[in-house]
Amino acid sequence: MTRRNLNGSRVLVTGGGSGIGRQMGVQAAERGAHVIIWDRDGKAGDRVRDEIRKAGGSAESHTVDITDVAGVNAAAKASGAVDVVINNAGIVAGKHLLDSTEDSIRRTYEVNALGLYWVTRAVLPGMIERGDGSVVTIASAAGLLGVAQQTDYSATKFAAVGFMESLRAEMRALGRPIDVLTVCPFFIDTGMFEGAQTKFPLLLPVLKEGPVANEVLNAIERRKPTLLLPPFARVLPLARLLPVRIFDRLADFLGVNQTMDHFVGRAGTKG
């Protein structure tokens, strides 16, 4: 299988106005892609668009709330052909279940889970018609392992992982040449998880957005189906095979359920 060349490709990034979304947009432009920024914060998206153009790249921006199906479809029509879509927009509340409000829980599901459907459904037909494309979702390590204070966030990321696994199976069953890449990173230092901590920073470090963005774009070009970051995160799927008591002890040793004890975070779109 030949590598995907981002040079000349049209790359759509949701939540592209900040954080890792911004980084992926900027770096994709540096690789020669035309970058399409979607963000609910239109001014943030415009700033990234202007940043890319100032550096000599090609970009456009659209104000889009991915929970609004009609708005997503209109933005997809305005954006034109998309070769690579990166489902990056997301939110986190970081509260215990009984402290979470109904509105917060509902909004987390609408953005993190349902938004994947609306965006992917809007751009996938064009990819299939052209006989090529790449669907990428920035899920989370919390989509592989349930974490305290993330009952809503973790559940939506499990949904994202399942969505992408099913989409990949569907494309293969239908004989569609569409790449499907699921990215499951540990905490990324974007402000979204401000205050989150790790007990073993050498094994599970808080990741830097620039290197993560680079890894994601490399994985897209290599047509990889999955990307788990950091490398130690690759043991998480295997850990699920352990007996529950041993699994719980391992999680306790790694301090998994204490990572959110000092969480502050910020509301908004994830990069």
Residue ranges and their predicted role:
Residues 88-93:
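Conserved NAD(P)H cofactor-binding loop of Rossmann-fold oxidoreductase domains
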